[in-house]
Amino acid sequence: MEVILLERIAKLGQMGETVKVRDGFARNYLLPLGKALRANAANKARFESERSTLEARNLERKSEAQKVADSLDGKSFIIVRSAGETGQLYGSVAARDIVETLAAEGFNINRNQVDLNQPIKAIGLHKVTLHLHGEVDVAIEINVARSAEEAERQAKGESLTSADAIYGVDEDALKPEDFFNPEAELESEEE
């Protein structure tokens, strides 16, 4: 199906371009959300008559998104979750959790604006991209930890999943002899 784009859409085209897309993408996403019109003679004429208002509205949305991006840029947000000793989460952190955390901080972001290929399943610092507008993206840092104190330690660069953090043992100081001493086993068998 051919459609006329009413705004810039990543990996598809600029506002005003006529592009060919799959029928389902047009019917289920582009047309219901008002991001495109079917490419027929009546809609082409309608688009040309409304082009200046669409461009002004798009510019306004972009400036609003840029303001939000400027306030979010480089910020870190803490999400506290239960996790095992190795840092594996009991569950995961999904886009919905990130949106809730941002909403608690006063940012109104939709779940579909969070670029998260797969849920976060381990504690640590994770970079997440937010697509606020077709031309405005911002990267934020999500600090997933077991507690607020651990989040502060992680932010300072401390690893919470190393042997030292878990068991109080320095990984570099361990020698193979500490794990397996064949002579000690022989001595215990002789006794």
From Swiss-Prot:
Keywords, ordered alphabetically: Ribonucleoprotein, Ribosomal protein, RNA-binding, rRNA-binding
A GO BP annotation: translation
A Pfam family annotated for this UniProt entry: Ribosomal_L9_C
Residues covered by region (Disordered): 171-191
One of the record's GO cellular component terms: ribosome
Gene Ontology molecular function terms on file: rRNA binding; structural constituent of ribosome
Cited SUPFAM superfamilies: L9 N-domain-like, Ribosomal protein L9 C-domain
Descriptive protein name: Large ribosomal subunit protein bL9
